[in-house]
Amino acid sequence: MSRLFNNFLLKTNKNQFIQSFSTKSQINNNIFNNLIKNEKISLPPPPFLSSSSPLSMNNIFNRNNKNLYTTNNFNYNKLQFTTQSPNPTPTPTPTPTPTPTPNNNENNNNKNNNNNNFKEEQKKILQEKNKAIGLYVLIAIIGILGLSYAAVPLYRIFCRATGYGGTTRDADDFDVIRKRNLDRTVYPIKVTFSASTANKIPWTFKPTQSTIECLPGEPVLCFYRATNNTDTPIIGVATYNITPMKAGTYFTKIQCFCFDEQRINAHETIDMPVLFVIEPELLDDKNMKGVSDITLSYTFFKSNDQGEYEEI
């Protein structure tokens, strides 16, 4: 064995052998050189010395016939070692999941369904908006009609409470008059009475007295007379006015036939009372200085079947 190894060393370059071995394997060069120098490595006999067959370290034995290295091979022709690595475990390549090819018909059906749903939602929203608008318009129309029917009574109540437009104010209790302070210089006020009717009413309507003089704070009772000249009963209601208009604030009616509807039968004549008082505060109003005449006028209107008033 030693001769064969020596012949091998003579035919090859020792340094090239060692360098090739060290670059291709993990064996320390110093250890391998020491083994060669000390002739502790024995080579196997032919046919392993053939130039075409690699020499495995499994075939290199020491003198005790023990395996030295098991993972390194070298070739005699190329004089270099090659590392024999174990066969790597192949990594399984994931099989791509086939992407399902979308069906054009299904896509078209889905698009059509989405478009139909969107159109239906838009229709519902538009219908709700139209319903809301219609409800608001209906409420507005009802409110306008209600105000038109209630305009005359509301105007009368407003004028009666504020004295606007010469309308007299009502007194709820006769005791209010007694509480007025009459400790002031007073002078008589002349009150003129006037009556009128619409052209359509076949009534004769006039005051029983044309004028009257009274002191501010003094209750005054007067009458108006009305006669129905037809063969059928007629129901009417009267409105009143005061001139000058600024005197209406101080003209308070305690009782008046104009508060209620008046029914007069065929060819019937009735007397209708008016109880009023002129407030003494009129004497303290600078705007009323020089005012000594006040006119109280009434006009009758017809009450129709619907409870509304129309001029007659």
From Swiss-Prot:
The chain crosses the membrane at residues 132-152. It comes from the Eukaryota. One of its GO terms (cellular component) is mitochondrial inner membrane. GO terms for biological process: aerobic respiration; protein-containing complex assembly. Residues 87-101 have a biased composition (Pro residues). Residues 102-117 have a biased composition (Low complexity). Keywords: Copper, Membrane, Mitochondrion, Mitochondrion inner membrane, Transit peptide, Transmembrane, Transmembrane helix. Residues 79-117 are annotated as: Disordered. It is found in: Mitochondrion inner membrane. InterPro entries: CtaG/Cox11_dom_sf, Cyt_c_oxidase_assmbl_CtaG. Residues 153-312 are mitochondrial intermembrane. It is a single-pass membrane protein. It holds the Pfam family CtaG_Cox11. GO terms for molecular function: copper ion binding. Exerts its effect at some terminal stage of cytochrome c oxidase synthesis, probably by being involved in the insertion of the copper B into subunit I. PANTHER family: CYTOCHROME C OXIDASE ASSEMBLY PROTEIN COX11, MITOCHONDRIAL-RELATED, CYTOCHROME C OXIDASE ASSEMBLY PROTEIN COX11-RELATED. Belongs to the COX11/CtaG family. This is Cytochrome c oxidase assembly protein COX11, mitochondrial. It comes from Dictyostelium discoideum.
